[in-house]
A protein has these predicted regions:
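Asp-based, Mg2+/Mn2+-dependent phosphohydrolase catalytic module
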Residues: 1-15, 19, 125-211
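Active-site neighborhood of HAD-like aspartate-dependent phosphohydrolases
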Residues: 2-52
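Helix N-cap/beta->alpha junction signal
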Residues: 29, 102, 124-125, 180
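Short, surface-exposed acidic
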Residues: 40-51, 79-92, 171, 211
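Metal-dependent phosphoesterase signature
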Residues: 60-103
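Short, acidic loop-to-helix structural element flanking the phosphoryl-transfer center
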Residues: 85-119, 157, 200
């Protein structure tokens, strides 16, 4: 058996960073949607609960339907709770939530990218590229692996394999950062160095060997 290559002292324990987008880099402001829900007598979070039910969200994450068609699915899910007009307003408000990028996270990732490839790996709609452009982040990563473009949704092992291949790095030499425990566990099971993101400090600690 061929021994694993010896790595120089001080070299980082990974050769690529694979990073989620939503709730790591990008954060949404739901206050407008919450106000609409209150105005029509719905409990806060009802629209999101309907929208992100697996059977409703999966088609848009796989790129099989557009965000606008997703709104129609949300309207169907809200039937009986509010009027059709109100349901459409709620669905539209959800897909148009304002968002921002976390400057600290972006800065950390840009610094890391000077040392190793950076790949964004995200469950997203076909709107992702336009959203990254709106945030001024089209050039943030070397590659973007979006579920809607590749037809694979985390935690499917194949999306991690694809991301590592895009980076040109073995799975066990990748750092993976995500805010969803299920995705972190799936990545770890494949041998990736997986980090469950809660705040920017988690990312800074994980990237410390590069910074």
């Amino acid at each position: 058996m061929t021994p694993a290559p010896t790595r120089a002292l001080g070299e980082p324990p990974f050769d690529a960073v694979l990073c989620d987008v939503d709730n790591v880099i990008r954060f949404y402001d739901p206050s407008g949607l919450t106000a609409l829900e209150r105005a029509v007598g719905l409990a806060e979070g009802t629209t999101a609960k309907v929208a992100f039910a697996p059977e409703t969200v999966r088609p848009v994450l796989l790129g099989r339907i557009t965000p606008q068609e997703w709104v129609l699915s949300i309207v169907d899910g809200l039937t009986g709770l509010v009027s059709g007009t109100q349901a459409h307003e709620l669905g539209k408000a959800l897909i148009e939530l304002p968002f921002r990028a976390d400057g600290t996270v972006v800065s950390l990732l840009r610094r890391a990218r000077t040392r190793v490839p950076l790949v964004l790996v995200t469950n997203a709609t076909v709107q992702l590229e336009a959203d990254l452009a709106a945030l001024g982040l089209s050039d943030l990563a070397d590659h973007v692996v979006s579920s809607a473009r590749v037809g694979l949704v985390k935690p499917d092992p194949r999306i991690f394999e694809l991301a590592a291949a895009r980076a040109g790095v073995r799975l066990d030499r990748c750092l993976f950062v995500d805010d969803t425990g299920e995705n972190v566990d799936a990545a770890a099971a494949l041998g990736l160095r997986a980090v469950h993101f809660h705040e920017a400090a988690d990312l800074e600690r994980a990237l410390a060997p590069l910074l």
